[in-house]
């Protein structure tokens, strides 16, 4: 099972304040433990929302672009992990070990696997080009 762990940072981080080196060391130790256990698939930190944009769609289906920063900082994702584990309980156990250096909360979401969808959805989603791209990305991530 794959899970995405979304990290919601403190207001300081959203304002662009960098963490102190000790906090980074603690987070890297956690990341190394994830990697050694074979659970780490991917991770990244994100720039503050001031460098981003939000795209929503109006009732007519027209995209509306709003440049950051976003005032609702509790809704801003500051980073993520993708982990692969056997159960949700194992994923929760990993999340409880995340150093609280900058994270004010994390959200754990299971990632859909193609086999989670009904056969007709799998067939509709089958695209040789997309499948080849995903396989190439997964192969490069393993090397």
Regions found by a protein language model. Name each.
Residues 1-143:
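Conserved, structured core segments of small domains
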